[in-house]
């Protein structure tokens, strides 16, 4: 989920988020939970940071709210002032025990691999980042509904190329419905993505903890598949407004409601070996819940 979607993209995303809720009612053949990965303790959080916010308040907020990983937007065209800001952010994160990952991505990267690889190389060359956090979302391309079969192979190739391009681990944002897509030959798209990245953040954007159409409920299949692949999977929680999808975000609720719900997610997700905590999207709208 990029910083703020334009109205057309937001409308398209809402259709995906709302329509795919019907998937929860469809029986699926799921992989076993698997014992291969370590479960994050309750309260483990991550956070997206898309804007060029002042570093100290960001890190103070993050540390106070259990954030152990920060995904900070990186522009490969960043000038000296922005690089100094990121260096300050890195130093403060190090002091607070928070890992700093470079955040970037665009649906166009699905086929514009040179742009994506230039970004990855530039981010790695700064020496500021622990990993690369990529948010590509090819399903937001206008051609996705009709050309999905043509777009999936370059998307998977991109993830592999990025993973091979640097020594930094690559973590990908993925929609919770990814396992519903089957590739030519019968492979599941979620399994194919997990095979190419170090970990995933599931955009499980719901504002209830458990049940058929909840954060844990919609992410169950991906959590199981991540466990079988021995890859960590964070669950995502949205605090920005998402069009007409009132149950997809905590926007308009409260910090207390968010905290209570995410604590319940922590408890319910302990049964999944792949569970790596909860990532909150994003800093500014999360802070706004407390005002």
Q: What is each stretch, according to the model?
A:
Residues 27-76, 172-176, 278-286:
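Boundary/entry segment of secreted carbohydrate-active catalytic domains
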Residues 50, 99-112, 155-185, 230-241, ...:
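Aromatic-lined carbohydrate-recognition surfaces of secreted/lumenal glycan-active proteins
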Residues 71-76, 119-152, 276-280:
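Active-site groove signature of glycoside hydrolases
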Residues 231-291:
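Substrate-binding cleft of secreted/luminal carbohydrate-active enzymes
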Residues 72, 130, 136-140, 186-215:
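Aromatic- and acid-rich polysaccharide-binding/catalytic face
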Residues 1-17:
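N-terminal Sec-pathway targeting helices
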Residues 72-105, 146-172:
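Aromatic-lined substrate-binding rim segments of carbohydrate-active enzymes
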Residues 49-64, 111-125, 181-193, 215, ...:
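Short, acidic/polar
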